[in-house]
Amino acid sequence: MKQIFGKIWPHLAVILGLAIFSIFYFLPENAENKVLPQSDVQHSLSMQTEIRKYQAEEGREILWTNSMFSGMPSFQIYGGGGHTFDFVPRFVYSAMQLTKGISSPTGLLFACSIGFYLMMLCFRFNWKYALAGALLFGLSTSFIHLIGTGHVNKVMVLALLPPTIGAMWLLYQGKYLLGSALTALFVNLQIMTNHPQISFYYAFLAAFFVIGIGIHMIRTKQARTFIIATGLLGASAIVGVLPNLPKLLTTKEYSEETTRGASLITKDGKVAQGMDKEYAFGWSLSVMESMTHFIPNILGGPSNEFFVQDENSNSMRALQALNNSDQANQLAQATSKYFG
């Protein structure tokens, strides 16, 4: 018993430490009941008003709402994230968020940190290095910005990526049972969180991972282990996806009727192919913008912040020197701190 406790106590201490750190990092939320003005969360609550009202009055969920885009399936914007076999995933999900809920900054910071810590343990790092990596990952500039804006589902899926990769690594280390179980669990949680875009990107990462480790294992005469592990990986992924299949299939069916599929409106006998590339990638990072993950404000700053907001700035003095308020107001829009 002492031996077992001696092995697990550092990890219990780390979990407790990360929880305390997350609570203190967002102390105003936890001690003063203050709330971050997460714009996306507020927008979501507004979109869900009709659905929540119906649920409160009728005691059951409504499957359609008229409040969005002249009508759409309600499960696209509210609920519908669980499935019949979700007891264990829900328990893990809740534990990773300190039971505070997915929109809580504290819970999201803890989830990101503990997820990376689990991956580091799967790669057999000492708990001290794993803790350092967990803190660095959790405090990534991108995560703090995403949490502040309210991209909570995206952050939660990103928090689940490291343990999914760690579970895959266990499979290729010959730990078939544990690796399969964890892979199925974390894939399940990813899909259940309902941000398919990030899970789609993860699929590419997983493919490169398998190809890379496959080349190494074949060269080192571990082809049999590689084949078994890859087969179990595929089976585990299927097991993780299957409980969420109703949600995925209905989303696929619905997407074909939106601007993300081919348009039903014809012009000059031609059918449009949905949204154009510039619109689809309008909020995606360019190559240089990706460097903001490592160097904050490398391209200036947020596009909604302007140099003229500082009354002592050179920009403000230059506009005041114009002695033309209309021209100054027009030029003020060109003083955005973002220049990417």
Residue ranges and their predicted role:
Residues M1-L27, R224-A237:
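Start-transfer (signal-anchor) and selected internal transmembrane alpha helices
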Residues F21-S113, L135-L158, V271-G340:
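Membrane-interface coil-to-helix junctions
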Residues Q55-E57, L171-Y172, I215-K221, F294:
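Hydrophobic residues in alpha-helical segments
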Residues F26, N30-K34, G174, H195, ...:
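Transmembrane helix-loop junctions in multipass membrane proteins, especially transporters and channels
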Residues W9, A13, A95-S104, N126-G133, ...:
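Membrane-interface starts of transmembrane alpha-helices
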Residues A229-S286, N297:
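Polar, glycine-rich mid-to-C-terminal structural blocks
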Residues S113-C122, K128-M217, A229, L233-T251:
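Membrane-embedded helix bundles of polyisoprenyl
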Residues L12-L18, Q55, G79, H83-P89, ...:
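Mature extracytoplasmic enzyme cores
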